Amino acid sequence: MNGKKLYISDVTLRDGMHAIRHQYSLAQVQQIAGALDKAGVDSIEVAHGDGLQGSSFNYGFGAHSDIAWIEAAAAAVSQAKIATLLLPGIGTLHDLKAAYQAGARVVRVATHCSEADVAAQHIAFARELGMDTVGFLMMSHMISPQALAQQALKMESYGATCIYVVDSGGAMNMNDIRDRFRALKAVLKPETATGMHAHHNLSLGVANSIVAVEEGCDRIDASLAGMGAGAGNAPLEVFIAAADKLGWQHGTDLYALMNAADELVRPLQDRPVRVDRETLALGYAGVYSSFLRHSEAAAKRYGLSAVDILVELGKRRMVGGQEDMIVDVALDLLNRNK
């Protein structure tokens, strides 16, 4: 770590959206953003779980617009930067500009790990706006470390100043993370930062984040009480406690984070965010974590097991954006069971 300060990127108000089907109220967003700001995090990501303009029939409708959520969070902070997420093809340049005008100063442009080239325009435009521009390679477990590094290079060439390894399926272990960071570091410019976005489906969210930092990672994504898709993200308060024990500089108030997690966030969970039969299946099968609630709904509708649906999705190598295939898989299983 050599005494550098970690950049703590909170995702409670974006990835955490998945855990409550994108239903945060504006008051809740203000309360949580305010608490995170006081606790000293560097950035607070705010958007529908699937990024700007994710509110849709396919992904689930949000209680509010991204812009309303971003404005609410921006009004509640004095130190932290407001971040947002954009998936090219869902969000447009127009949406990014609107988010910037509403107060977002960091954008993470997210693509499937093998499709960095779809982000070129959005990354370039974010740089033009003067935003802190991050490339976000989702489902990073699905390609080799060397292939991932080539995609990271593309994002860097478009103008991203930080590249993330994103374990959307919560499917990687510490060796997988180590290998990917070494591969990225071997090809990226020394001034290009790196980040880690973990999911806790195999209970390795914190361990994987620690290994990333050991390999030179600069930014860590985490959320209060792990609020996020699947078994959630690396729980922020747990990661900070572990980082503290390691003597790492993080600039946040552990007790304030612990209080916010238990008093503000955990009570909102209508389905516990934890490792259980279904969320473990996500990590084991390497499935996109936000498929959880959609698969549980399909299982209920067709009288199937959510685990069977998730395992089949893993076999078919489905990725984010293919939510419509969940019903397809359910109907196939139904016919198979006849």
UniProtKB/Swiss-Prot annotation:
Which keywords does this Swiss-Prot/TrEMBL entry list? Aromatic hydrocarbons catabolism, Lyase, Manganese, Metal-binding
**CDD domains attached to this UniProt entry:** DRE_TIM_HOA (cd07943)
Q: In which pathway does it act?
A: Aromatic compound metabolism; 3-phenylpropanoate degradation
Give the catalysed reaction(s), semicolon-separated: (S)-4-hydroxy-2-oxopentanoate = acetaldehyde + pyruvate
From the UniProt record, give one GO term of the biological process aspect: 3-phenylpropionate catabolic process
Q: Which residues bind Mn(2+)?
A: 15, 197, 199
**UniProt-annotated catalytic positions:** 18 (proton acceptor)
Enzyme Commission designation? 4.1.3.39
**One GO MF term:** 4-hydroxy-2-oxovalerate aldolase activity
**Can you tell me which residues bind substrate?**
14-15, 168, 197, 288
Q: Which residues form the Pyruvate carboxyltransferase domain?
A: 6-258
Q: Which Pfam families match?
A: DmpG_comm (PF07836), HMGL-like (PF00682)
EC top class, as a word: lyase
Q: Where is this site: Transition state stabilizer?
A: 14
Q: Which HAMAP family match?
A: HOA (MF_01656)
Q: Which family does it belong to?
A: Belongs to the 4-hydroxy-2-oxovalerate aldolase family.
Summary of the function given for this chain in its UniProt record:
Catalyzes the retro-aldol cleavage of 4-hydroxy-2-oxopentanoate to pyruvate and acetaldehyde. Is involved in the meta-cleavage pathway for the degradation of aromatic compounds.
PANTHER family per record: 2-ISOPROPYLMALATE SYNTHASE 1, CHLOROPLASTIC-RELATED (PTHR10277:SF9), HOMOCITRATE SYNTHASE-RELATED (PTHR10277)
The record describes its quaternary structure and partners as: Interacts with MhpF.
**What name has this protein been given in UniProt?**
4-hydroxy-2-oxovalerate aldolase
- Organism, per UniProt? Klebsiella pneumoniae subsp. pneumoniae (strain ATCC 700721 / MGH 78578)
